[in-house]
Regions:
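Active-site-proximal gating segment of KS-fold condensing enzymes and close homologs
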Residues: 23, 80-99
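Conserved "HGTGT" condensation-loop signature of ketosynthase/thiolase-family condensing enzymes
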Residues: 1-80
Length: 99
């Protein structure tokens, strides 16, 4: 009988960040820095760079998972991806491209 399970996870966080103050400034006075930090809880937030698409970030997270677990990539049958994109048309899940 085949067993199913999660043996590890990986993460990728973009190198570029925006601060709560920068977010407040972009609202042109609608939100103060204090409101962004205290009410929304955002002190700094990662922001994807030019090369940080959903699939690219997913692949980097997958490489991190492989490094953390020592699993041979050829032994993986399925990849679950929780990356998110918004478009006005149907999209294929990034997990298919990452695998």
């Amino acid at each position: 009988m085949t067993t199913v399970g999660i043996v590890g996870t990986g993460i990728y966080i973009p190198e570029t960040f925006v601060t709560g103050e920068e977010i407040a400034n972009k609202t042109q006075g609608v939100w103060s820095k204090e409101a962004v930090v205290e009410k929304l809880g955002i002190r700094k937030k990662p922001v994807p760079g030019d090369g940080d698409g959903t699939q690219e970030m997913g692949a980097l997270a997958a490489l991190d998972a492989l490094k953390n677990t020592g699993v041979n990539p050829l032994d993986i049958d399925v990849i679950l991806s929780v990356g998110e994109e918004w478009k006005e048309y149907p999209l294929t899940t990034s997990a298919l491209y990452i695998q």
